[in-house]
């Protein structure tokens, strides 16, 4: 039944969304196995879960699974361009599920959606648990509580005009408005949140920064560093969805072209592999000597951006850092160069500086594709305004890969909920899921690919010092 409190683009898209969900079920064996094992037990009975994660078909199946396991849910997307409106429509019809997401939100609308997903009652009551991607929901709670304390002690409100960009101004404006309505909303909310689970490298970095400053207000589980998330979603997911996004956006041939991959972490490895497989000449920029030598050993040229900026045909950022491709680089690019980002946030490329630069002409070619005429007459193509091109110009990672990531999210949420009164997890610390669960997630997906495990005999188990059921590797093992 549709929850009238939801805000989506078009409810009539729900039947198509449900059909897509049904098709994707066969490609998400881990998610479906969890349903079979836990649905009758209803382990999330009584739990209120807020999600801030790309509202795709795969996410719709995650939401439906959490709902079938007994949770009540409020959900928003974590990117203004990544929502698939038919997916949002489909899940909005589920019982005990409210959705606040549509494709093409403004930044003001985006943060409104995040606040709505976090707010469970008229008095500002919040969730028990947060499923996060980029840590935006958790960040809002933390910064809201921080500014409430400042207001309580010094009567100082956040100044939206002090924001360094439009998004920060919208963010500060929301918190200011919230404090004027309810000056203890975020503080009280944080006290009752059991914990959050974070999906991305960038989000984990945010959480770690807060933790380092002793500011973490509730438990955090780092899903990103589970092997079955990091090595599958980050590598194989990007290897599929980067070329998908580039082809849908540009229809340009990749074979023979010069592709510059900025960053050679797991995401960069997947991107470089995809481009190499399509016949591109791949160049990598890196700051880390270990990652750099890995790139060289895979046959890639490791250069500085300054060396290659005037020659590249495609530039892809995937560093999780800021200001990787600066305005000065963009202005030097060759005619028809394509610039895109597959890192979580939009600050890897100085798109805003480019769009506001004197002498620039911007022509929207189609949704999330802009052709920019530079002062020297060259035209470059900017994808998704520097936001995630694989989710903005295409539909993101395939369902099979997301099944791994979302199994980890569910197990993280279960760990937090089932141990809420045991003292296993401290309030102000972050954790990684146990290796047993990592191996369990991998096991769930073997049958779908017709893979059969070899079983150790007793003598082999004794020699290795492991049990027949695992875990098979130490925590220090690097896959």
Swiss-Prot record:
Pathway recorded for this protein: Amino-acid biosynthesis; L-homocysteine biosynthesis; L-homocysteine from S-adenosyl-L-homocysteine: step 1/1
PROSITE patterns: ADOHCYASE_1, ADOHCYASE_2
Annotated binding of substrate, by residue: 56, 133, 199, 229, 233
Key words of the record: Hydrolase, NAD, One-carbon metabolism
Origin superkingdom: Eukaryota
Binding site for NAD(+): 200-202, 234, 263-268, 286, 321, 342-344, 390
The protein's enzyme class: hydrolase
Gene Ontology CC: cytosol
Reaction equation(s) it catalyzes: S-adenosyl-L-homocysteine + H2O = L-homocysteine + adenosine
Disulfide bond sites: none
UniProt cofactor note: Binds 1 NAD(+) per subunit.
Any one GO biological process: S-adenosylmethionine cycle
Pfam family, one: AdoHcyase
Stored PANTHER family: ADENOSYLHOMOCYSTEINASE (PTHR23420:SF0)
Function (record text): Adenosylhomocysteine is a competitive inhibitor of S-adenosyl-L-methionine-dependent methyl transferase reactions; therefore adenosylhomocysteinase may play a key role in the control of methylations via regulation of the intracellular concentration of adenosylhomocysteine.
Subunit and partners: Homotetramer.
Family the UniProt entry places it in: Belongs to the adenosylhomocysteinase family.
Record-given protein name: Adenosylhomocysteinase
